[in-house]
Amino acid sequence: MTRFACFLFSTLLLSFSYAAITPTSPLSIGQTLSSPNGIFELGFFSPNNSRNLYVGIWFKGIIPRTVVWVANRENSVTDATADLAISSNGSLLLFDGKHSTVWSTGETFASNGSSAELSDSGNLLVIDKVSGITLWQSFEHLGDTMLPYSSLMYNPGTGEKRVLSSWKSYTDPLPGEFVGYITTQVPPQGFIMRGSKPYWRSGPWAKTRFTGVPLTDESYTHPFSVQQDANGSVYFSHLQRNFKRSLLVLTSEGSLKVTHHNGTDWVLNIDVPANTCDFYGVCGPFGLCVMSIPPKCKCFKGFVPQFSEEWKRGNWTGGCVRRTELLCQGNSTGRHVNVFHPVANIKPPDFYEFVSSGSAEECYQSCLHNCSCLAFAYINGIGCLIWNQELMDVMQFSVGGELLSIRLASSEMGGNQRKKTIIASIVSISLFVTLASAAFGFWRYRLKHNAIVSKVSLQGAWRNDLKSEDVSGLYFFEMKTIEIATNNFSLVNKLGQGGFGPVYKGKLQDGKEIAVKRLSSSSGQGKEEFMNEILLISKLQHINLVRILGCCIEGEERLLVYEFMVNKSLDTFIFDSRKRVEIDWPKRFSIIQGIARGLLYLHRDSRLRIIHRDVKVSNILLDDKMNPKISDFGLARMYEGTKYQDNTRRIVGTLGYMSPEYAWTGVFSEKSDTYSFGVLLLEVISGEKISRFSYDKERKNLLAYAWESWCENGGVGFLDKDATDSCHPSEVGRCVQIGLLCVQHQPADRPNTLELLSMLTTTSDLPLPKEPTFAVHTSDDGSRTSDLITVNEVTQSVVLGR
């Protein structure tokens, strides 16, 4: 097995590029087919260094490899003699080592002169070289990704559909549970389905935009096109207007992401569903999901919850029902027993019907005189839409959206004179009671006021500080929502305990799992660290950074709400003798590279330049696919684009991970994070902890052990014994050498993060490291570290004053 993996790895590295696949020139493992200008490449690849081989298309020269199309996603090959060939009947076939057909284009052609070529748009074409006719193309057989000018399609006459189908997981191209498609409604709209149930809906198309995705108007001009031909077929295309390399992908988690490559990294432009309100029908029929902080459901005016007790508990899927039934027949005689209530900033509901109408007034009249019409909207780029069924999947944006007018009984909007008289009488009678109790109430209020004013002022100050910053997309959760999600912070939901305070697992009403960090009053981390983490991480988006969803500031409570990482933190695997066997060398190496990419984004590629100052194993979280996510930005610092060094009078961090210049003088730079990464890298390789490890009589630490191992055997003996069976020795030795370069005493001798990632992703020559001189030794009883670093290290850091 190991020999095969080593052979396969080396074979894949020896890549030879071809211009076309012909009957006499098949494509074998180790060979690639390049587009004319070298934008795309087709070849064999193996996700996550497994034995399974697939034929795929990816962007050439972009690391990590971004696969945009897979031919044999349902049938991998596992032998090194597979090839992709043009058959005598003109079709494209994938053969395994036994020359059995694993995948084919599925059609035969009366052509023996065809060839397969890859265009600069990423489209794989089978072309008849005699006539020049395209016989088959990959753009008509999409996977999980749309490239510019490829398209989704639905032909209602034939039933033919061209859809997006998610991967089963991040590393498994098998079709997953999510499917994206375009409808043939007038106007069309996009859907993501999870199995047979709607998961997300775009809202109807309005000439240049989807009405349920306002960002397509404001931040990413006209990235889509929807066209309908004479046969009624609808085509949805992702256009390339501003970026040379861009894509739309349906992820294995059900997210639809539009990204572009800026020359260094992928930048996220659109990501839906992005919040609670985006999920289909979260508030049920006639329920309105309001994009407040946090998002919440409410009933339209004139409606009440169908199941009031469930509604109070935050279970909104039952929706709402009318308080007063409609009496429609009077409208035609002038007795307006029904009225229309306008609601602004709305994502138009599902189940709409298009009505030919020249103006908003005509749209109103067409609904007014139709007893079954429950609502209408006149939308620029569409015209008149009416609803004859329940209003489902409605959300209200803070900005943007459409005006929806809902039919109500006139009594819901006012009432008759008798009703006004009764109300006036009730008010008069109540006035005396109110005045009589006012004095007593005021006296009690004065007693309580002084006791609570400081808490309110503090809470308001924190909220005002945040609102004065640009924290768009950050939600302010209500304490009640968090309490429901975490089962009142029960011990069963507790994930761990750190210096920040306890961390709890929670589940929101829409089923989304979250992690909640609850600031402890005894924590050394206060308002500065809390605010710092919110302001920094809310402005960052990268696959290798943990995503903050929001916060809660209520009374003395201060909580941070994150996306939940099912595999917790890296230290729970690396330092656990039973679980470390689950992370073989390929997984460890992939995690190492992911962390480096996250640091490069922080240091160089984000719009903020950030030094983390607390990079350590316990601050690396792992999602369900073992992708690493850098977390805990409470100690991070921003620096200006041309300023690569700063200092501080308050030294914060974790013993063992702090660089010499930072621990001794308070000077920090991106090279400080490089040092911390080096320690982390050596921990991941060895499975040993910097704060607990020592060996021989001199009690040498992990850095000294790594140095001696590298000098004696190239670092191969430094590897955790539980990972040796799956390793590539030269790769391990290279990583040990990189780790030693990162922990050099002088910052100038350490690589920056751009150089670091290049070292980890190429086979270029490495500088020779010097023996590391900075070490934190562990005493015999462990007392030096046991009081400073907790066992699980969820958030604990050392604070040293100078």
UniProtKB/Swiss-Prot annotation:
The UniProt entry, under SUPFAM superfamilies, shows: alpha-D-mannose-specific plant lectins, Protein kinase-like (PK-like)
EC category:
transferase
Family the entry assigns: Belongs to the protein kinase superfamily. Ser/Thr protein kinase family.
Localization, per the record, is: Cell membrane
Q: Which InterPro entries match?
A: Bulb-type_lectin_dom (IPR001480), Bulb-type_lectin_dom_sf (IPR036426), EGF-like_dom (IPR000742), Kinase-like_dom_sf (IPR011009), Pan_app (IPR003609), Prot_kinase_dom (IPR000719), S-locus_recpt_kinase_C (IPR021820), S_locus_glycoprot_dom (IPR000858)
Which parts of this chain are annotated as the region CaM-binding?
Answer: 578-595
Q: Which residues are reported to carry the modification Phosphothreonine?
A: T648
The topology of this chain with respect to the membrane is: Single-pass type I membrane protein
Keyword terms, alphabetized? ATP-binding, Cell membrane, Disulfide bond, EGF-like domain, Glycoprotein, Kinase, Lectin, Membrane, Nucleotide-binding, Phosphoprotein, Receptor, Serine/threonine-protein kinase, Signal, Transferase, Transmembrane, Transmembrane helix
The answer, when asked if ATP-binding is one of the entry's keywords, is: yes
| Organism expressing this protein natively | Arabidopsis thaliana
Cystines in this chain: C277-C289, C283-C297, C363-C384, C367-C373
Source taxonomy lineage?
A: Eukaryota, Viridiplantae, Streptophyta, Embryophyta, Tracheophyta
Protein name as annotated: G-type lectin S-receptor-like serine/threonine-protein kinase At1g61550
Q: Give residue ranges on the Cytoplasmic side.
A: 443-802
UniProt keyword Phosphoprotein, yes or no: yes
Kindly list the GO CC terms recorded for this protein: plasma membrane
Q: A single Gene Ontology molecular function, please? A: carbohydrate binding
- The active-site annotation reads D614 (proton acceptor)
Residue ranges constituting the Bulb-type lectin domain according to the UniProt record: 20-139
Record Pfam families: B_lectin (PF01453), DUF3403 (PF11883), PAN_2 (PF08276), PK_Tyr_Ser-Thr (PF07714), S_locus_glycop (PF00954)
UniProt signal peptide: 1-19
A biological process from GO: recognition of pollen
> Catalysed reaction per UniProt?
L-seryl-[protein] + ATP = O-phospho-L-seryl-[protein] + ADP + H(+); L-threonyl-[protein] + ATP = O-phospho-L-threonyl-[protein] + ADP + H(+)
Q: Where are the transmembrane segments?
A: 422-442
